Amino acid sequence: MRKAVKNFMYKLARLSAEGRFQTLVILFVAIIVFAFGCLGIQYLLIGDWSPWRIIELLLDPGAFAGSSANSLPIEFQLLITLFGVVFFTAILINVVANFFDSVINDYRKGVERPPFKNHTLILGANSMLDNILRSIKQSEGAKMSKIMIVTSGDAEELRNRLITTFGKSVMGRISVMRGRREMLSELHQLSDALARSIYFLGEDDEPNHDAKSLRCYRHLQTLCAGAKRRRIECVVVLNQTSSSHILQYEQTTDEHSPIKTTYINAVENHAQRLLVSRNFRLHDNTLYPALYREGITAESECGVHLVVTGMTPIAFAVATTAAQICHFPNFVTKGVRTKISLVAPKIGHDMELFIDRYAHLFALSHYKLLSWDAEGQRREQNFEPKAEYGDFLDIEWEFIDANIESPHVRDWLSTCAEADTKSEYLSLAICGDDAVQNVASSLYLPQSLYERNIPIFVYQPTYGEVLQRAHNTKRYATLYPFGMRSDCFDPTLQARLQVAKRGNALYATLLGQTPDEETLWDSLNYTLRRANLWAANSVEVKLCSVVTNLDDEVELLAEVEHNRWNVERLLMGFTSLSRAERDEYNAIVNTAEAERTEAQREQLARFRLAKQRDFVHYDIVPYDSLSDSAKNIDREFIKNIHQLVK
């Protein structure tokens, strides 16, 4: 008996904890059963079905004082009164109070799901969240849509922080929920009346961030498949460059999809904000200094020299972004290449990984490994482009096997600083994983770097306030923090995407197409969208390379654009044909179609299949070897370049 009672009490407690409505239902059922039982007993005792005396005793214990005047036995009336005291005066009040406490607690913890429609759904609450909310507020103004934020963290803590940041008026449009975005059932509940836009953010420093976001995106595709709903604007944030690499091989587009998707690689976006948009402080329009200073023209003797310390994801992003944009006319006229130096202790393994990742680029590149032995003797290994491909890229690489604090690297940096404005424009990006160590490294560099005003960019993923203060001093005026997570989503990203869409529309116009920018953009796969973004990123660099009149330098800048395009394609994983293969391909395409042999047709089909399947591109060649039709595309791009930044 004791065990049965204990089991009953456990189940009752669990039911009360897990569901507030169940407790109320059980209570009211118990009251009704007791009341009808009492009514039956009353009928047996006095033959009366009237319920009013029973109700009176249940609701008002004071009514027991007049029990002697009633025909019911006093003992029976006492039993009803005691039951009423226990259930109505004590338990019912407690249950109702607990009910409202539970409602409030569920809201605070983010358990309650508001019945939103046509809202903005933000899955995750990483450091980009505040800027996304500011962007929505700025674009929508007083008509700001309802926003639902789903976080796997503490919903109440997040809500309180947002109230402090944005105020109660804005928070009246925002609800914070707790949930896991990668769960299909969770996403189905959140999007039962699907949002008009969804941001897949994730949380800061969460494991398997990209895998969770891509899984969530796949769940969304499943929910939308075959459903007649309005189109959803979707933004997917990725943190790993390998995720972007994989997406390059997907051929899907948004042309007939119910989801319009924009992928943002957070690490690459930090690098583009630093080197392309160059927005140091948005509130006063202060810019980061350009790697190319005021511009590099055909007559310039200087080339860009970017030194990047650390072999980290942000270091790779900064280095490859520089390789995307730093292409100048003086390579055509004087053979001056952009130089990118990567510095790290025990660099061998990371260097091999980096070279393997961009194997097709390094097959055509000049690069070298610089190190010092135990006696301080300098050792240098030089690598040349493979002879079968040719030597035509305008980027060269250095890998330096030493710590930035080592005497050898400090001497080397001092030598580079002495060459600044004479044979190169030196810039330094400190990109280690440890933000505190990055600050220390930036403060104790060779004195000549500060004296010669060499730009020093310091990666600060959390807060940049320490270096902001340092930047305001005379000694450290050339120190610039970058990469703060809160800056990842900002107006500069949208501006770059807009230029990319205009560039794609310009290219389509050259091919005789006339759809609008958004329709054309939807028809592109991830690789082509990325290519257009990279082309847009280089526009400002080209405009700074013009001496007087753009029309006088079209051919020169067209060659510069093709040099940039070569590196872009190689960074994306495309490979070039060998010289022998290029000669064979040119011989086939220069033969009239009617005159081609069967063997030539089969070989041409193999070339085209290799381009689609293996990313082999036959236009990765020196500009002089390019077909006239391909050259015309570069020329028209240059002629219309001002339209892209209107």
Where are these regions (language model features)?
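Preference for protein termini
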Residues: 552-556, 592, 600, 646
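Cytosolic regulatory regions of ion transport systems
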Residues: 1-35, 40-586, 622-632, 638
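Surface-exposed intrinsically disordered loops and tails
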Residues: 378-384, 577-618
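In a subset of proteins, long, contiguous C-terminal domains/tails are tracked
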Residues: 96, 602, 607-609, 616-646
